[in-house]
A protein has these predicted regions:
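Phosphate/ribose-recognition catalytic cores of enzymes acting on nucleotide-derived substrates
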Residues: 193-241
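Classical nucleotidyltransferase
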Residues: 100-203
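A glycine-rich helix N-cap at a beta->alpha junction
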Residues: 73-90
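Glycine-rich, highly charged phosphate/nucleotide-binding loops
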Residues: 69-77, 100-107
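N-terminal catalytic cores of NTP/NDP-binding nucleotidyl/phosphoryl-transfer enzymes
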Residues: 9-73
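Short acidic-hydrophobic, aromatic-tinged amphipathic segments that line or gate anion-handling sites
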Residues: 2-9
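Residue-level signal for inorganic ion chemistry
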Residues: 28, 81, 119, 176, ...
């Protein structure tokens, strides 16, 4: 999978492409419905398979939220998507200038100029200045076809990144794993702590979790991977184990 960062400069791609588009935080089973549609269309039409996402939350860039936290980091998303056999991952460098683009300018710059022949998006996808663009805007464009994926339900409710964050905040890891379609995972570097656990005979590893959303405070059974080797353990989320 080739990773292409899009910053407004011309990209030399001439092959016809089928691309999903969205933020894809969590890469949950609703998102995977879009990825599977990309695979289906690409196999049928002979297109290259792609996914287009953004490097930052639009609301964060626009100053409407103070913290930028994710269910899956960009590195997580890259690792997960590499397993899906995509040809391209397009990462739009989201800036205030990108946010100010009209829907028509966004389509021209980020879809038509990339030779996207088929767009796959969720039913509630919005884009362009003031979120003025939607699925009907895309469908009105004559240069490509569009697949609109309806909502994916779990227990009668729409699966969304917002719902998963709420479930995670409640510490309901079992339901979260069902919504993700895999086990919840975070990654980070081990950093130096106060060595309290070591002093009482229970050495611990303090992990810098970067900008992840985390479950509520508590103690959780985990499997930790270090250099590819898995270890069963307990994880305390909070201040004093």
């Amino acid at each position: 999978m080739e990773i292409v960062y899009l910053d407004g400069q011309k990209v030399n791609i001439v092959e016809p492409i089928c691309s999903a588009i969205g933020f894809f935080d969590g890469l949950h089973i609703g998102h995977m419905a879009l990825v599977n549609e990309v695979k289906r269309v690409s196999e049928q039409k002979g297109y290259k398979k792609a996914l287009m996402t953004f490097d930052h939350y639009p609301l964060y860039v626009l100053g409407k939220i103070k913290e930028e936290k994710y269910l899956t980091s960009m590195n997580d998303r890259i690792s997960l998507l590499e397993k899906e056999g995509l040809d391209y991952l397009f990462i739009v460098k989201f800036t205030k200038e990108v946010a100010a683009l009209s829907p028509e300018d966004f389509i021209n710059q980020y879809l038509i100029d990339l030779h996207v022949m088929h767009v796959v998006c969720g039913f509630d996808f919005r884009f362009g200045k003031y979120n003025a663009g939607n699925t009907m805007t895309l469908q009105a464009c004559q240069q490509f076809n569009v697949s609109v994926i309806p909502e994916v339900l779990y227990k009668g409710e729409k699966i969304s990144s917002t719902r998963i964050r709420h479930v995670l905040e409640q510490g309901n890891i079992e339901e979260m794993n069902e919504l993700l379609g895999r086990k919840y995972c975070v990654s980070g570097e081990v950093i130096k702590g106060r060595r309290i656990g070591h002093a009482i005979g229970f050495p611990t590893a303090n992990v810098d979790y970067q900008s992840y959303f985390l479950p509520c405070h508590g103690v959780y059974i985990v499997k930790a991977y270090v250099h590819g080797q898995g270890y069963m353990g307990m994880c305390n989320i909070g201040y004093n184990p």
